[in-house]
From Swiss-Prot:
Its cofactor is Mg(2+). Changing Q97A: Does not affect overall protein structure. No impact on interaction with FliM. No impact on interaction with FliM. Phosphorylated by CheA-2 and to a lesser extend by VieS. This is Chemotaxis protein CheY-3. It is found in: Cytoplasm. Binds 1 Mg(2+) ion per subunit. It comes from Vibrio cholerae serotype O1 (strain ATCC 39541 / Classical Ogawa 395 / O395). Changing E100A: No impact on interaction with FliM. PANTHER family: TWO-COMPONENT RESPONSE REGULATOR (PTHR43228), TWO-COMPONENT RESPONSE REGULATOR ARR22 (PTHR43228:SF1). Residues 10-127 form the Response regulatory domain. Pfam families: Response_reg (PF00072). The gene is cheY-3. The modification 4-aspartylphosphate is found at D60.
Amino acid sequence: MEAILNKNMKILIVDDFSTMRRIVKNLLRDLGFNNTQEADDGLTALPMLKKGDFDFVVTDWNMPGMQGIDLLKNIRADEELKHLPVLMITAEAKREQIIEAAQAGVNGYIVKPFTAATLKEKLDKIFERL
């Protein structure tokens, strides 16, 4: 059964590479999600999350300032944010990193490069479990 996804949910896309943010944004738009905002690293993203009633976070791992894994840990440690689903899209395919992300509470993990179908499948899986 496919999860019923709220197409109006507010999504924050966090990646230091603007092209990657645009790719993710376009794929989300193709899936019907138009309510997206962008941040270029965890240091920029965290204050946005604290005051922005976001419903979902898509983040890269390797970024200057604050890495995606640290952003995830900060989200999970914050009473207001800890419920937020987080999807990590990264080139980091090492088993240790996938385990570290899982232990930190990531909801989904996609290794680049990826397709729209992979993104949709992960979103469906994440929202089935919420």
